[in-house]
Amino acid sequence: MGPRALLLLLSGVLILTETRAGSHSLRYFSTAVSRPGLGEPRYLEVGYVDDTQFVQFDSDAPNPRMEPRARWVEQEGPEYWDRNTRNAKGNAQSFRVNLNTLRGYYNQSEAGSHTLQWMSGCDVGPDGALRRGFMQYGYDGRDYLALNEDLRSWTAGETEAQITKRKWEAAGYAEVQRNYLEGECVEWLRRYLENGKDTLLRADPPKAHVTHHPISGREVTLRCWALGFYPEEISLTWQHDGEDQTQDMELVETRPSGDGTFQKWAALVVPSGDEQRYTCRVQHEGLQEPLTLRWEPPQPSFLTMGIIVGLVLLVVTGAVVAGVVICMKKRSGEKGGNYIQASSSDSAQGSDVSLTVPKV
């Protein structure tokens, strides 16, 4: 399984909760996948500030270390990277032990591959104060155990998780997590936001347009595109004569563009000929005001119009020239054959002159 597949696993059972405008989040995601007969489980850990990945650890790397994934975190000193590498390696070992323990809880054989996922993080409001902390575990794609919003108790997702819940309650593990989330997590988030403010606090507005896709003679699909925006949160809504059509439209998940920005589209099937009655409303914090877009039928380009005008002139000119030639031939015939054929050296000049429209 490649790094991309492992990263996709991170967003499977562990649900990403949206941050509101003006708020920010620090999140760490970890995944361990057992692979019987192929050695130790693979462990991957990534860190995000808002929608931006800034660190990554991969146990399968030639020299496994916590590595930067954003320029603004590269300024951290060697002690930072050594400490986070030690923490990641310790987490990897804990995950390997936990995979074996959970396999026993579920009475599973050693032959199958299993996945353990973990997410931990904090959200702060515009004032920088903690708004919410969270920690979740997932096993084989299902919720296993989660810290409640009070940061003092746990919710078990499955019967087998009750065993872990009792252990953690006895050990006071909720208090340990609460102290981290209310203290260290918030402090590091503030530091990252300050160091990476040029990137993390920016608001890139979307570039939006509508495309037209005929389905049949009676229906077409209108697709509203929003490209190149940051942060991730955006709203696309189709309207018919001003009324929202959210129930009927197809809306894809926001996707990374690969350059630090995001993209999204919303589509709606409409009757052919009624396209101008439908508008797409785009809302994003990078916009001073929402955009309202319609599908614009393609207009003939300047080049196309020039070609058309040129062809018309050519046809008209050709007709005039043909008329002049016929007239001259008739006159020559009337004068008894005084027409003299031009030499080959004169014929090129004659052709240029003949393209001139004669005065009348």
Curated annotation (Swiss-Prot):
The chain crosses the membrane at residues 309-328. The keyword Disulfide bond applies. Heterodimer of an alpha chain and a beta chain (beta-2-microglobulin). Residues 22-308 are extracellular. Residues 206-292 form the Ig-like C1-type domain. Residues 22-111 are annotated as: Alpha-1. Disulfide bonds join C122-C185, C224-C280. Glycans are attached at N107. Belongs to the MHC class I family. Involved in the presentation of foreign antigens to the immune system. It comes from Bos taurus (Bovine). It is a single-pass type I membrane protein. Its main location: membrane. The keyword Protease does not apply. The modification Phosphoserine is found at S351, S354. Keywords: Disulfide bond, Glycoprotein, Immunity, Membrane, MHC I, Phosphoprotein, Signal, Transmembrane, Transmembrane helix. Residues 329-360 are cytoplasmic. This is BOLA class I histocompatibility antigen, alpha chain BL3-6. GO terms for molecular function: peptide antigen binding; signaling receptor binding. Residues 1-21 form the signal peptide.
